[in-house]
């Protein structure tokens, strides 16, 4: 990935994403960056490295001593979205059928959730479910379901970072 000066688009720092995959520990020479989002908690980018399954927390406060924290998630990371508090970043590992959850305040993974076939790599949607409280929902490419994941570890700890419902044809 490249960190650039915003107004001029001048490259300031180029960082390789080459590395080992999280599951088989095979070397991948050209993994792609699938998403880059800005943290609401720290001067930090959250970078999804697709083929390796690693999420990089890139502290850009000192480019001369760049600090990168590596979190192991699941291969085939794609895009994702924030919970309603903008603390937790939920991101799809679409061909691994998982959703990874990053706590951007504490800078760690808090969940790697098994979901139904091919979660859609999108931003998702946040709303308050009448039974499960705050949830984040995402569709799928491999089926017609919308998966709901509980996102309130303080108020609804028993549902946090779990699939609480799947909405599909049976609910229509």
Indicate where each model-derived feature is located.
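Predominantly soluble domains enriched in secretory-pathway, periplasmic, or organellar proteins
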Residues: 1-171
């Amino acid at each position: 990935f490249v960190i650039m000066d915003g107004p001029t688009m001048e490259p300031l720092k180029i960082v390789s994403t080459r590395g080992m995959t999280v599951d088989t520990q095979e070397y991948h020479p050209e993994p792609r960056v699938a998403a880059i989002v800005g943290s609401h908690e720290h001067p930090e980018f959250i970078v999804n490295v697709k083929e390796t399954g690693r999420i990089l927390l890139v502290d850009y406060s000192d480019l001369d001593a760049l600090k990168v924290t590596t979190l192991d998630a699941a291969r085939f990371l794609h895009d994702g979205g924030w919970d309603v508090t903008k603390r937790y970043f939920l991101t799809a590992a679409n061909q691994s059928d998982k959703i990874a959850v990053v706590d951007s305040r504490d800078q760690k993974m808090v969940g790697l959730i098994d979901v139904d076939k091919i979660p859609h790599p999108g931003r998702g949607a946040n709303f308050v479910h009448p039974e499960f409280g705050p949830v984040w929902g995402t569709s799928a490419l491999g089926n017609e379901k919308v998966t709901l994941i509980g996102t309130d570890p303080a108020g609804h700890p028993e549902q946090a970072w779990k699939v609480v419902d799947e909405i599909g044809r049976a609910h229509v």
